[in-house]
Amino acid sequence: MVLNYIWIAFFLIAFVVALAKLVIGGDTTVFTEIINSSFASAKTGFEISLGLTGILSLWLGIMKIGEKGGMIQAFARLASPVFSKLFPGIPKDHPVTGSIFMNLSANLLGLDNAATPMGLKAMQQLQELNEGKKDTASNPMIMFLCINASGLTLIPITIMMYRAQLGAANPSDVFLPIMLATFTSTLVAILAVCIQQRINILQKNLLLFFGGLSAFIGGLIWLFNSLEQEQVSLYSTLFSNTLLFTIICGFIVSGVRKKLNVYDAFIEGAKEGFQTAITIIPYLIAVLVGIGVFRASGAMDFIIEGVRMGVAAIGLDTEFVGALPTMLMKPLSGSGARGMMLDAMNTYGADSFVGRLSSIVQGSCDTTFYVVALYYGSVGIRNTRYTVPCALLADLAGAIAAVTLTYLFFQQA
């Protein structure tokens, strides 16, 4: 229901703002821009779905081989001690645990093209376990979606690449703040859902997991700081893609050992990928059109200016307001937030306070509404329950952490 209200609000707020701009400001092009944006967003939604078709077919084919070869079940057993606590509604050693593990691992490595199909496969398996209404999100679905929307990634290669292209003296100087901000976002997402689902977060396995993850991130930060920027990009890309292809070959070998017809198993999974891509089209178009209309009306500009005036009125520093477009756009549109980040770096400079803050915000979380539309749309979920509020709370935590860390690390820069 929350997503329904937000979607309606996109259109009604856009209409009110556009009408005010027409009547008061004399802007005769605003409604034309809104309509053009709705058409362009619908086209973009279809093109994204079309682009996902090949990737989904590839990875769901690979996942089917791994499932029949027993590799997914092996991953499920590996992740069971932690996931059984975070996802108590999933039976022990169920294949979906392995799919979730694969998805989160791919996200950590920044392998988006692999993570999305794995996540959609996990959603299909979670839907099979959904004992309630099939159009209503289950508890494990909500936990899975919120962790995904928090966007935990170990090495933000793309952001550092953009900073290098725009002339940053040290493109990797945002690595540590991004790591801390996205860890904060993920932690808040998990805590929010645990509170809603009354999951005891003080269980031994969970405490060991978060402690181990914190130690691992600390070690990675130490290693990162000892390497040059070019070495970081080289080694992280090499490691990620080598690991990914090793997993693919491991799946194939597992199928051979089980004496499967590996080719037929791949085709079976690839067919599921094609069907999934078709299923998500209307959900993706609905969300992207709503966001596009909201942006084109100029409503976001009014929000940003209102925040700037409010912050100034209470005597706080307003330097961070220059990055607000990226903060507000991030939950709505990944490409939009990326454009806002690049615009901030072009306008203020890649090494400016705003340029760095925009980069940190971009890496602090994922695109909530896109993730919700894509993943829930793939299994026909309409009632998302408290998914969106928890995910947006994580986005807010990530944004606050990004601002705080930028002041801490770069205010005197």
Where are the language model's segments positioned?
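Signature of multi-pass transmembrane helix bundles
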Residues: 1-54, 161-295, 312-314, 386-413
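Membrane-embedded alpha-helical segments and adjacent helix-loop junctions characteristic
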Residues: 31-128, 258-347
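Hydrophobic alpha-helical segments, principally membrane-spanning helices and signal/leader peptides
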Residues: 36-39, 46, 95-97, 133-141, ...
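C-terminal transmembrane helix pair
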Residues: 114-115, 122-163, 168-198, 324-413
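Hydrophobic alpha-helical context, especially transmembrane and signal-peptide helices
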Residues: 5, 33, 45, 94, ...
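Short glycine/serine/threonine-biased micro-segments
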Residues: 12, 59, 68, 108, ...
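Short, amphipathic, aromatic/basic-enriched membrane-interface segments that mark the entry/exit
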Residues: 26-28, 88, 357, 361
